[in-house]
Amino acid sequence: FGSGVGLNSFAVVTIGIGVGYSLTVNGEPIENPDKSYGLVGHTLVDPDGPRCISGHKGCATCLTDNSIATEYSEMIGHPATFDEFAAAARASKTQATNLVNRTCFRLGTLIATIANLAMPDKIMIAGESSFIAKLGVGDLRNGINMYRHSQAAPVDFEIADHDWAMWGKAAAAQAIRQYVG
């Protein structure tokens, strides 16, 4: 089931409370003992972006809900939650829309980096905040195109609606595969 069926390789990037990344090749997820350290979160996506709690400037951690809420709060001049940002973005409020576009360009930069290095057949964008990518898909494409060679194949990507049931099915499928083969 799902968008990865029939593909030789695919990557999944998640945005929300954190930033996640996984790669599947020949139907098998790439396993590594370092996978739980959130390594993709410290990939540079905007040299002028905000600092993360580790002190990195412009790393992919700026795609997390907390970082977006902080950046939005600075833009509007008072504290705001991520949910307030999301409501303003969905209502096309100017400052929220500007941050959506900036965030999507940054996400596109991350997608291009993954496409350039891992060369998956497709990249899925998922997570509880993936709706942001749908609001700024033009800037997402601009971010990809900025860092993707013009003669390389276009990056095939899909923005998934967040669905906890799909996460559960994916986990169940992995467990079943281990026992059934």
Go through each PLM region and give its residues.
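Phosphate-binding/catalytic loop of phosphoryl-transfer enzymes
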Residues: 1-58, 176-181
